[in-house]
Amino acid sequence: MMGAMMSPPILSESKIQQHSLRHLRAFLAVIDTGSITRAAELCFVSQPAVTQALSKIEKTAGLMLFSRTPQRIFANSAGEVLARRVERAFGYLDPALSELSPRLRVTATTSQLKALIAVRETENFTLAARQLGLSQPAVYRAVSQLEEVAARPLFERTPYGLVATRPAQALAQAARLALLELEQADADLAELTAAEIGRIVIGATPLAKSYLLPKAIASFRKFRPNLPIQIQEGPYGDLLTALRRGDVDFLLGALRDPPPIGDVEQKVLFHDTIVLVSGCSHPLAGRREIAIEDLTSFPWVVAQKGTPIRRYFDQIFSDAEGGAPKNIVETGSLILMRELLDTSEHLGCTSRLQAEAEIARGLMQALPFDMSKTSRPIGVTVRKDWLPTAAQRTFLELLPTPPERDL
């Protein structure tokens, strides 16, 4: 369930993804026009082709998607659920396709887009083929077909691999988010029959792993006992990238001020403060008062540069003679911090909520140094236009907040 950040996989093949983009466009056209005849005209296909496309989509969905009257055909509740996801998918995809060539909106296929995504991520046709489980010539041909319609190369050859052009990067990103919408359409449709389909992928910082997730997962299992949950770990920057490209559904941890980029939104759950800690046998353990000068002569275990905790740590020593300590170990691992504090005279700077359990068990000790002005928001970061599935929404509603007390 829990794993470190790795090369992102191509999105799993969902039931709705099995249909061609042309079929899905015909599905939307029927809903928009209320007429198979008119939809066929708009999509430049025959009426039997549209009828066949609708039949196949309904069979895959396992649900009737349309109601019919003598005057028109219209989406029922299940059809509206699917249409919402398909519309969102093309909302991502069509602008990026049109930027390369308007013809791509007609000719591009799911297989071609998956090949583009894989080559962009691996920067190599052979590695992309391995990732997709295809032959190298098949991947090369799929990308070449996109390039032929676009009338331009999508990749530049460099000594280090294939680098996607800017329009190709935009299309690969849009395609990834579009395919994610089609994958989540399966989950939305399953909700209508009380089935469990899909998964939740969470980007987690150290505080989220130690405080937020255990309680939320335990509560979630009472409602969704079988739905897979995957935890992705890594530096904040990597997790943010994974969030923006759709590899994780949401990111839990310390929020940034200002928000890191315009296409994400942050929601505050509560505030946490920083605490300075030592091992229980440390020379400073048990002291009633500690001055800044007492802290500068010991080695430290601290978070990496660029993190909120590290910023507060540096501020502590901003007025100290000689500045911040130089003999530091940079890590986000509370386990490594705990062991270093236990076996040496290292001091630590970490989240109070994250350290509470260790302090309560007597594995480390909070130092009496005023950190009341280090309050920082903890919460959820999501893509700005994200539409959660019912399961994802339930999980977010179950995220714990700490009891009201002075941190």
Residue ranges and their predicted role:
Residues 365-407:
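A late-sequence structural motif
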Residues 284-285, 299-320, 388-392, 396-398, ...:
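Secondary-structure junction motif
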Residues 107, 192, 216, 237-274, ...:
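Short beta-strand-centered segments that line the small-molecule binding cleft or hinge
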Residues 30-44, 119-133:
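Short helix-boundary/capping micro-motifs
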Residues 122, 127-144, 148, 198-257:
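Central regulatory/effector-binding core of bacterial HTH transcription factors
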Residues 235-248, 254, 312-366:
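Hydrophobic hinge/microswitch elements
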Residues 58-75, 147-164:
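A short LG(V/I)-centered, amphipathic sequence patch enriched
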Residues 194, 263-300:
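Flexible hinge/capping segments at coil-to-helix
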